[in-house]
């Protein structure tokens, strides 16, 4: 059993995986963000508030998996990358401050279909449906 499976078995990301399944089978509430979990220690060490949930909006997820032919600036990431997201944010290769204020960039060890490393942009302390969260604002290969 790998570390990812152990985390799932412990229930830490079970709700996230259920939401991703609903997203892909079309039964998710598209008006609500997907909750990945609490902000990871790695992000907290880099300046994120660890008491906040980490989320991704459906619109952002659509852009991340969409084809550039179908969605403006679609990133065409496959489902496996989306499913690995929480685990990659637990232990990213590197985190640095983005040029955007109140934002971090996480470098993962995942690769997109073109062989580019996958990066995750996290906007810190964002208001989302009247709650403050740390929100994934983009996920792409570069």
Features from the language model and the residues they span:
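Ribonuclease/tRNase effector modules and their secretory precursors
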Residues: 1-142
